[in-house]
Amino acid sequence: MQANSVQEGGSSADVIRHLVLLGDALENIDIGAEPVEAVLVPRPRNPWKLTILEAPHVLERGWSRAIPIDATHIGICIDGGWAIEASGLLRSGAASVSGALETLAEAADQFEEVFAKLIDSAREAGLPTVVCTLVPSRHEDPARRRIAATALAIFNDRIIRQSVAAKLSIVDLRFVCDEESDYATETLLSRAGVRKVANVGRSALYEVSREPGRTRVYF
């Protein structure tokens, strides 16, 4: 079944009844004691639920077998900060430009491998799906912010390439999360930022449910 396709059944194909989030983007965000659903959508028109599946769980279960059978929509959203941190670029200077680029390329390759498998999961499930780019950081140190932005651009290029190849639509968080109030820390979103992402993502899911089959960019 084609990704971004609309499955039969239910009162309306574009009603989000069960959203499955593939990725760890909400893992380190402090949303308080409220249910995640209430933070993302404070006053929903229809009852809905959220299932978060981090990449290791999806890969261990074998792609779409990890996705609940009653899922209606999928969002793919990964915190790429771990990969950028793992590259070591933000912690110490590189001996050479070529060495820094090679280290970054290796980290991006690892990231893309995981990301591609999450896309395969969504395509196999055949549910309306949107993909989120990585969130920009807000490091106070200008040099650190520039390095992070450069690394982020390479990772986002991998996301866009995989998404376009799979004909999945993209929520570009670089344009969504563009205010200081969207961030709780240098690298983590605030509740307000999370809610902005949820609003754009929800609109994107509604549209790809009604008009599947081609890549669009939302922000």
Regions found by a protein language model. Give the residues of each.
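Solvent-exposed, well-ordered amphipathic alpha-helical segments
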Residues: 1, 9-20, 117-130, 166-169, ...
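Serine-esterase "nucleophile elbow" of acetyl-processing enzymes
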Residues: 1-59, 64-69
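Intrinsic structural disorder
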Residues: 1-4, 38-39, 151, 172, ...
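Conserved catalytic region of serine esterases and O-acyltransferases that act on ester linkages
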Residues: 2-3, 14, 62-63, 70, ...
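Short flexible/disordered coil segments
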Residues: 9-11, 22, 44-49, 53, ...
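Alpha-helical cap/lid subdomain in secreted, periplasmic
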Residues: 41, 61-191, 195
